[in-house]
Amino acid sequence: MEAAARRRQHPGAAGGAGAQPGASFLQARHSSGKADEAVGTAPFHLDLWFYFTLQNWVLDFGRPIAMLVFPLEWFPLNKPSVGDYFHMAYNIITPFLLLKLIERSPRTLPRSVIYVSIITFVMGASIHLVGDSVNHRLLFSGYQHHLSVRENPIIKNLSPETLIDSFELLYYYDEYLGHCMWYVPFFLILFIYFSGCFTPTKAESSMPGAALLLAMPSGLYYWYLVTEGQIFILFIFTFFAMLALVLHQKRKRLFLDSNGLFLFYSFALTLLLVALWVAWLWNDPVLRKKYPGVIYVPEPWAFYTLHVSSRP
């Protein structure tokens, strides 16, 4: 009788090993969902965003500049250049900072997608490292970025002609395959992180002064990334996906937190700068020839070799 009474008072204990195997799993998933809803808004990650912007400017934007500034005697053409070492550091530091951003997200994000994206990012950036290293070394031999591979004076007369095919393959790895495997996972990770940057409290949807100041160099760097990387389609798709997500979440009375606003405003500034850049060079006949088609977004280094370095 006492045992029966105890079983009636604690029905869960009576189930013991006979309880449904999925019950605890469903309960855990339900608890995890509740925890995501109840979690507070993350503060602005000033340290991570500052390091992220700084290393982008120094290790990515500054990479080709360092290759031109440092004496050639220090880094012979048959050895890695200072820009190559910058690129190696970028390939290590950037994935690390992206993972730290994901760790600080107040929401549970798809880890498997993040890990596969990071692996693909590192592989694509490493492919680009090799191709970009050779292409920038060709500048010292008279290679002109505003011309196609076959139209370049130092390449078009190579013999046998199959050598030209090899240089075109190198260009393909650098500008197409490397960029695709580098930038697609990069923007995918940023978008996944952005999807977790929403708060139910409108008062928390604001940016501190430091974030506003940091958004300007961040947006300017993404302008360089979009134009030099020739990824305008990928960028505009990501930006409009972010905009659509903001409008969708607004219906649920969810608003961007400071980190989401920082990323969104940085991309908005980038879009404005790209539009101004294209408008400025819209009627350039030489660049128009290199970038035919509907989408015309000249590369900054093509502009440099055409209008700056070619001056007497």
From Swiss-Prot:
The keyword Transmembrane applies. Residues 1-10 have a biased composition (Basic residues). GO terms for cellular component: early endosome; endoplasmic reticulum; endoplasmic reticulum lumen; endoplasmic reticulum membrane; membrane raft; nucleolus. Its main location: endoplasmic reticulum. It is found in: Endoplasmic reticulum membrane; Endoplasmic reticulum. One of its GO terms (biological process) is ganglioside metabolic process. Keywords: Endoplasmic reticulum, Membrane, Transmembrane, Transmembrane helix. The chain crosses the membrane at residues 57-77, 82-102, 112-132, 178-198, 205-225, 226-246, 261-281. It comes from the Eukaryota. This is Ceroid-lipofuscinosis neuronal protein 6 homolog. It comes from Canis lupus familiaris (Dog). The gene is CLN6.
